[in-house]
C-alpha cells in the first residue's frame, strides 16, 4: 500500500487542488494524511469541515479540482469500473468536472465481468456502507440486496466507466484488500 501512496503522490503535480469521495480505500492507506503532510497540494478535506455547509462547499469544489481521488465498488477483468452511489456526488465527480480522476482500487474488488461487479457492489459494499452510515435499509438488516426504493437507499445511481476521455482517468491497482 505504501507504494500505491508514493505512486499517487508522484502522479499529482505540486500546487494541484485535490479532493476525494467517501472512500474507505482512500482512508485505509492514509492518502488524506499523505496529501496534507506533503505540504504541496491544495487539499479539500470534507472530513475537516466545521459544519455541513462547509462540507457541501467541498463537495462542490470536487467539480473544479485538478485531481479527484476515488476507489470503486468493483473493477472487471477487462477494466470496466463500477460504482453505486446514494446521492450522486462520487459518480458525478468521476464523470464530470475534475481535470483528472485517479482510482485507487484493491484487488479484492476485481471481478470477472460487469454482472459480477454489480452484484459485488450491491450485495457486499452496499450493506457494509449502510451499516457504516447507520442508514435504515433492508440490506443493513440482513446483508442482502432487496433492490429497495427506500428513501435511504444508497444504490440510487449505478455508474459504469468503460472508456475514458484520453488521459482523464487513471487506475492504481493495489495488490491487497482495500475498503469493501
Where are these regions (language model features)?
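Conserved phosphate- and dinucleotide-binding cores of soluble alpha/beta proteins
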Residues: 62-180
Amino acid at each position: 500500500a505504501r507504494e500505491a501512496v508514493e505512486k499517487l503522490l508522484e502522479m499529482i503535480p505540486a500546487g494541484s487542488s485535490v479532493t476525494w469521495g467517501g472512500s474507505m480505500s482512500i482512508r485505509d492507506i492514509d492518502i488524506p494524511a499523505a496529501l496534507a503532510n506533503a505540504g504541496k497540494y491544495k487539499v479539500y478535506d470534507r472530513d475537516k469541515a466545521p459544519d455541513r455547509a462547509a462540507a457541501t462547499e467541498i463537495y462542490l469544489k470536487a467539480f473544479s479540482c485538478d485531481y479527484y481521488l476515488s476507489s470503486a465498488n468493483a473493477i472487471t477483468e477487462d477494466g470496466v469500473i463500477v460504482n453505486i452511489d446514494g446521492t450522486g456526488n462520487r459518480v458525478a465527480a468521476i464523470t464530470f468536472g475534475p481535470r483528472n480522476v485517479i482510482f485507487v482500487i484493491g484487488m479484492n474488488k476485481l471481478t470477472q465481468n460487469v454482472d459480477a461487479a454489480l452484484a459485488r457492489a450491491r450485495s457486499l459494499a452496499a450493506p457494509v456502507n449502510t451499516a457504516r452510515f447507520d442508514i435504515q435499509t433492508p440490506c443493513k438488516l440482513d446483508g442482502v440486496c432487496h433492490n429497495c426504493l427506500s428513501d435511504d437507499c444508497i444504490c440510487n445511481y449505478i455508474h459504469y466507466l468503460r472508456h475514458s476521455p484520453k488521459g482523464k482517468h487513471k487506475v492504481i491497482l493495489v495488490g491487497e484488500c482495500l475498503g469493501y
